UniProtKB/Swiss-Prot annotation:
HAMAP family: ThiG
Subcellular location: Cytoplasm
Domain of life per record: Bacteria
Protein purpose: Catalyzes the rearrangement of 1-deoxy-D-xylulose 5-phosphate (DXP) to produce the thiazole phosphate moiety of thiamine. Sulfur is provided by the thiocarboxylate moiety of the carrier protein ThiS. In vitro, sulfur can be provided by H(2)S.
Name used for this protein in its record: Thiazole synthase
Catalysis: reaction(s): [ThiS sulfur-carrier protein]-C-terminal-Gly-aminoethanethioate + 2-iminoacetate + 1-deoxy-D-xylulose 5-phosphate = [ThiS sulfur-carrier protein]-C-terminal Gly-Gly + 2-[(2R,5Z)-2-carboxy-4-methylthiazol-5(2H)-ylidene]ethyl phosphate + 2 H2O + H(+)
Annotated positions binding 1-deoxy-D-xylulose 5-phosphate: 156, 182-183, 204-205
Single biological process term from Gene Ontology: thiamine diphosphate biosynthetic process
One MF annotation (Gene Ontology) recorded for this entry: thiazole synthase activity
Protein species of origin: Shigella dysenteriae serotype 1 (strain Sd197)
ATP-binding is among the record's keywords: no
Keywords: Cytoplasm, Schiff base, Thiamine biosynthesis, Transferase
Annotated metabolic or biological route of this protein: Cofactor biosynthesis; thiamine diphosphate biosynthesis
Length: 256
């Protein structure tokens, strides 16, 4: 069970809505993923009407919507987008994204922390996308963020857990859920993230651009379940030395 703020989710997989070939394919993939928490960019939906091609099927699917501020380059822009989302969708939940450089899409740590502190004070449930910086993640937690969402690698890069060493520190010190966001490229990346202690992963590009997004979404669902089950089962410790699983000499002694 994944608990963030006042909500609980059976699934530990968060999904996005971008890059799908059609809204129908998007919804089919989300259903196959089992995800109950779905992000959507405010710049991609018509907030004036709920029959928007992206928004309407998501509402019908019964998932929890997590609007994001993708496209914001400053704290002020992100705060403005957050209030638009709250007014239009009736939710205090927000994925905070501030990335001023369109080439790399790396989160701005200074603007993110500034916006997070203000938005928490204004009653938002803030889930910030951030770099895999243990100090920053702790500061975001201290100002009241409901979770932290450090990147595994740049958005859409499919590189996997390139920041693993820093993610391990973040997981160890966090008292709020840690959701690895960005860079997850194949289901094995998601399984590894859950095995190492992450509470959830957010996957969008890897599902949306697959040749078969629906089956890829199912694969991610199974991978997340496997990673979580493996962690809960108590994996054996790593060793530099070999440890025999069967007696090496007993059968020789028995035959003498």
């Amino acid at each position: 069970m994944l608990r963030i703020a006042d909500k609980t989710f059976d699934s530990h997989l968060v999904t996005g809505t971008g890059k799908f070939a059609s809204s129908q394919l998007m919804v089919e993939a989300i259903r196959a993923s089992g995800s109950q928490l779905v992000t959507l960019a405010m710049k991609r939906v018509d907030l004036r009407q709920h029959n928007d091609a992206i928004l309407e099927p998501l509402i019908a699917a019964g998932v929890t919507l997590l609007p994001n501020t993708s496209g914001a380059k400053t704290a002020e822009e992100a705060i403005f987008a957050a209030h638009l989302a709250r007014e239009a969708l009736g939710t205090n939940w927000l994925k905070l994204e501030i990335h001023p450089d369109a080439r790399w899409l790396l989160p701005d740590p200074i603007e993110t922390l500034k916006a997070a502190e203000t938005l928490v004070q204004q009653g938002f449930v803030v889930l910030p996308y951030c770099g895999a910086d243990p100090v920053l993640c702790k500061r975001l937690e201290e100002v009241g963020c409901a979770a932290v969402m450090p990147l595994g690698a740049p958005i859409g890069s499919n590189q996997g857990l390139e920041t693993r060493a820093m993610l391990e520190i973040i997981i160890q010190q966090a008292t709020v859920p840690v959701v690895v966001d960005a860079g997850i490229g194949v289901p094995s990346h998601a399984a590894q993230a859950l095995e190492m202690g992450t509470d959830a992963v957010l996957v969008n590009t890897a599902i949306a651009v697959a040749d078969d997004p629906v089956n890829m979404a199912k694969a991610f669902r199974l991978a997340v379940e496997a990673g979580l089950l493996a962690r809960q089962s108590g994996p054996g410790s790593r060793s530099y030395f070999a440890h025999a699983t069967s007696p090496l000499t007993g059968f020789l002694e028995a035959s003498v």
